Amino acid sequence: PPLARNAYERYIHRLLRENDLYGHVVFTGSLNAQQMKERYLKSQVFVLPSSIENSPNSLGEAMLLGVPCIASDVGGVRCLMTHGVEGLIYPADDPHLLAYDICEMFAHPEKAAQMARAGREHAGKTHDAQKNLEILHQIYTEIAR
């Protein structure tokens, strides 16, 4: 196990050790955009286990790349996906339901793939850089008047 640099890392490493999870978790360190894309595409499921979020870019990125997604019900997550349609959403304070949802993704790969396709299509609309730039430009133009 790597040397933990702070209390949170020590906590994470303790959990990994206690649950015999070393070898199942990868700490990547900093990644450039291409490396991040490669990691996303190697993933069988993307999990956003946040307790606080606004509009999580990482969720949008995973959806755009067609990775099945599970996210905690915080911030703007419900604006990015609908539970059971583009992915799964669970209460942020329910780790047991998160574990269940992860197992469901693996137990039903056809359903996971269907949600991933729907997520990719939806994110293609909500995360279209050119469209979002035009909308922002229009908003700022209106404000400036």
Could you describe each region identified by the protein language model?
Residues 46-47:
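A short hydrophobic beta-strand element within the catalytic core of glycosyltransferases
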Residues 68-71, 81:
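Short hydrophobic beta-strand element within catalytic cores of glycosyltransferases
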Residues 97, 104, 111-126, 132-138:
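A short, well-ordered alpha-helix in the C-terminal region of glycosyltransferases
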Residues 30, 38-43:
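Short alpha-helical donor nucleotide-sugar binding micro-motif in glycosyltransferases
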Residues 51:
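Aromatic "clamp/platform" in nucleotide-sugar-dependent glycosyltransferases that forms part
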